[in-house]
Regions:
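Conserved N-terminal segment of class I S-adenosyl-L-methionine
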Residues: 1-80, 96-100, 105, 116, ...
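A short beta-strand submotif of the Rossmann-like class I SAM-dependent methyltransferase core
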Residues: 80-86
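A short His-aromatic
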Residues: 89-90
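Acidic donor-binding/catalytic loop of UDP-sugar-dependent glycosyltransferases
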Residues: 93
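Short glycine-centered segments of the SAM/dcSAM-binding site in methyltransferase folds
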Residues: 108-111
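Short "lid" loop at the C-terminus of a central beta-strand within the Rossmann-like core
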Residues: 115-121
Length: 212
C-alpha cells in the first residue's frame, strides 16, 4: 500500500536536508502527554530530527520517517503512536493509506498534532509545504472512521493547529453465512465460501470508506 510517491519523496528529502526542518516544535508538549497515558512503548511517526525520543529516555521509543535513511524501515506496533506536524504534509490522494498505516501500528493511543494553516516553507517545485490545509472539523471527520477521538484542542486561532488524542476503533468482522460443522469432508460449500468472502470485503470497504 503506497504512502508516498517517488517524486514527492525526493522533494521531502530536500526539505529534510535543511537545518530547520523537522525540529519537532511540539515535541515537549507531546512528551508531557505521553507520560500521562500509562504506556511503555512509543512510535514517533514522522520523527524528523528525533527530538521526541530524546525527551522520552524512559520509554521504548522507535522512530519512523520515510524520508530519512535508516529510519524508513517498517516500524513495529507501539502502545502510542505520536504523529506531530506530519499529516498536513501528506499527498491528499494517499492520506487514507497513511491513516490506515497509523491505525495498524497503534495498540492503545494515537496522539496527533496537525497544522491547519499554510506553511512558510516552500518546496523545490514551488508549492508551500502543507499540501492539506483544512479545519479541525474536517480532520475530525476524516479520522472518525478509524479512531475514537478522546479529546480535541483546536488552537488554529493561535496559529498552532489542532491537537487530538485518539483510540483506534476495534472492528469485529463476522461471516454472513454461518460455517456449519458436518461429518463430510467438505465442511463449507463453494457458494458459502464465496458469500463469506464477499460479505467480509463489503464490510471492510464500508468501514474504511471515510478514509479514502
Amino acid at each position: 500500500m503506497r504512502r508516498i510517491t517517488a517524486a514527492y519523496l525526493d522533494l521531502q528529502k530536500d526539505l529534510h536536508a535543511r537545518f530547520d526542518y523537522g525540529r519537532g516544535v511540539d515535541a515537549e508538549e507531546c512528551a508531557e502527554i505521553v507520560r500521562t497515558l500509562g504506556v511503555q512503548s512509543v512510535l514517533d511517526y514522522g520523527c524528523g530530527q528525533g527530538h521526541l525520543a530524546r525527551l522520552l529516555p524512559e520509554f521504548e521509543t522507535e522512530e519512523y520517517d520515510p524520508c530519512i535513511e535508516g529510519k524508513d524501515g517498517d516500524p513495529a506496533r507501539a502502545d502510542v503512536v505520536v504523529c506531530a506536524d506530519v499529516l498536513e504534509h501528506i499527498e491528499p490522494d494517499l492520506l487514507g493509506n497513511v491513516l490506515l498505516h497509523i491505525y495498524a501500528l497503534a495498540r492503545r493511543h494515537v496522539l496527533l498534532v496537525i497544522a491547519t494553516g499554510p506553511s512558510k516553507k516552500v518546496m523545490a517545485d514551488g508549492r508551500q509545504a502543507h499540501l492539506i490545509v483544512e479545519s479541525a472539523e474536517w480532520w475530525k471527520g476524516k479520522l472518525a472512521g478509524l479512531f475514537e477521538i478522546e479529546c480535541c484542542e483546536d488552537r488554529s486561532d493561535q496559529g498552532h493547529g489542532v491537537l487530538m488524542l485518539c483510540k483506534p476503533r476495534r472492528f469485529e468482522i463476522r461471516p454472513l453465512v454461518p460455517i456449519v460443522r458436518v461429518r463430510s469432508t467438505a465442511a463449507v460449500t463453494d457458494a458459502e465460501r464465496n458469500a463469506n468472502m464477499i460479505a467480509n470485503s463489503t464490510r471492510i470497504e464500508k468501514r474504511l470508506r471515510c478514509c479514502a
